[in-house]
Amino acid sequence: MEDSQDLNEQSVKKTCTESDVSQSQNSRSMEMQDLASPHTLVGGGDTPGSSKLEKSNLSSTSVTTNGTGGENMTVLNTADWLLSCNTPSSATMSLLAVKTEPLNSSETTATTGDGALDTFTGSVITSSGYSPRSAHQYSPQLYPSKPYPHILSTPAAQTMSAYAGQTQYSGMQQPAVYTAYSQTGQPYSLPTYDLGVMLPAIKTESGLSQTQSPLQSGCLSYSPGFSTPQPGQTPYSYQMPGSSFAPSSTIYANNSVSNSTNFSGSQQDYPSYTAFGQNQYAQYYSASTYGAYMTSNNTADGTPSSTSTYQLQESLPGLTNQPGEFDTMQSPSTPIKDLDERTCRSSGSKSRGRGRKNNPSPPPDSDLERVFVWDLDETIIVFHSLLTGSYAQKYGKDPPMAVTLGLRMEEMIFNLADTHLFFNDLEECDQVHIDDVSSDDNGQDLSTYSFATDGFHAAASSANLCLPTGVRGGVDWMRKLAFRYRRVKELYNTYKNNVGGLLGPAKRDAWLQLRAEIEGLTDSWLTNALKSLSIISTRSNCINVLVTTTQLIPALAKVLLYSLGGAFPIENIYSATKIGKESCFERIMQRFGRKVVYVVIGDGVEEEQAAKKHNMPFWRISSHSDLLALHQALELEYL
């Protein structure tokens, strides 16, 4: 090995008599023009009249990094140059001689046997820490009179772009055109060192030193055709036709694939390219064998996806059986599939009794953030305290007048419930929610159905089929029960904002008069409550839910007569008469989930304890000031 180094050093030190260059010793290294024209080199100090450079100038810039020095300059072989790159020094490098070594082990490249080699696998790039270097000498035996085609030159540097931090790559630019080179000697090639490790910095044409990013280390290294994998090389060898390779304009573009002319793919002599560091630089490789998210396993048969460096324009059969191929047929289940499976398993499992169906819940992508759970009596409306006279005593009103107004409203509530909402039929068959018996409904058209003659009330009275314990009758009777609740739901949705149309003209006037008198007696209690309800209703991420101890049908009549239908959809009304408010809160949490915030608004102890058990904030309503404070908090978006 040492003998080979000496022979190359002696060969490089021979003079070149046909050279004439300008003085450029004091400029920074990375001016590649002298490399592009190796036959126009400076002569040695012993060649008379061959150069304007003096012997003293050459010797003043020479430095030895391995303990050996020449008379005029230091000749570094590849190993010495590697050591100098790793050693920070203020000295300058005078010359770099690229040396060819005999084939050995796994560090050499196998040539194709052609006499002319069109690519140069190395790259002559200096470190950013070196001072200006002197001119170079090359042996005329090593370099014929024709220029070497693939040494980086000024035209090539103009198309380069600093790679560090760059996200877009111009991979379709044409390489610079060079004069054809016919080499007669042995082709020059660096040993297969990792150029990204050897070269710490790249100096561009403008003179700015670009620090090499980690993505550059182990970048693509192209050589005339490897027969065996190289050291540090993954077993993925991409065999591609020459037409499918588009040269990039990055830092390795000109010394890797540029030819003497703008050649087509058929003129390329070296179709085999190997890639280093595949596990770290995924952006260089086509992901064709890795199927898209949850697709079938025939993805490799289609057109592979392109990468930032090169494009594979046709499928590569050799990649379909790589060790890292992803088998999508045995892929793990996705979150969407798991959600669907859980939904199928849990559907109906939480239903209480035979006829109850799960309440409609918001879709998975719902933006619901807050649920306001309201009590009805003495919170939104003043009703029970009017009947007992407690409201009149507390606020100094006329007790007989208050009781009279309460009785008139109670009569109107039950009249509406009996006349239009089948309360006579459903009083003994009360439900917690309007959809609890919808599973028994067969969807029959009710436009011509006669509820008075279907025999539902007689069967229920004689056989006592509907008991508070939840015992139910036969299938036919349950279907008739479901018909009635469906009809109630239709009437509610039709007249929730126009209860006067349901009452008729005569009763409508009486209802409006009664409402005005109650508002006057209660100092606009309902009006203040409606302000807060309307604010919540206008929010897209909030919802109102009503939980009352009144039976479901009378509760619906109250909501209609107090003009609350616009604030409470019928699906959001629950009756706690049979199961209590705590159980109603549990059903509401099961419906809307535990990620939303629940705010309970009421006046009684029962809803306060239920809210405390489920860690829900509780807003107590005991006077007008509490309603006004709630409205202000909602206006300021504290709630």
Swiss-Prot record:
Cofactor(s) the protein needs: Mg(2+)
Sites of the Glycyl lysine isopeptide (Lys-Gly) (interchain with G-Cter in SUMO2) crosslink: 14, 52
List of catalytic residues: 375, 377
CDD domains per the UniProt record, alphabetical: HAD_Eya
Coiled coil: none
Modified-residue entries (Phosphoserine), positions: 361
Task performed by this protein: Tyrosine phosphatase that specifically dephosphorylates 'Tyr-142' of histone H2AX (H2AXY142ph). 'Tyr-142' phosphorylation of histone H2AX plays a central role in DNA repair and acts as a mark that distinguishes between apoptotic and repair responses to genotoxic stress. Promotes efficient DNA repair by dephosphorylating H2AX, promoting the recruitment of DNA repair complexes containing MDC1. Its function as histone phosphatase probably explains its role in transcription regulation during organogenesis. May be involved in development of the eye.
Sequence positions bearing N-acetylmethionine: 1
Name of the protein in question: Protein phosphatase EYA4
Source organism of this protein record: Homo sapiens
This enzyme's EC code(s): 3.1.3.48
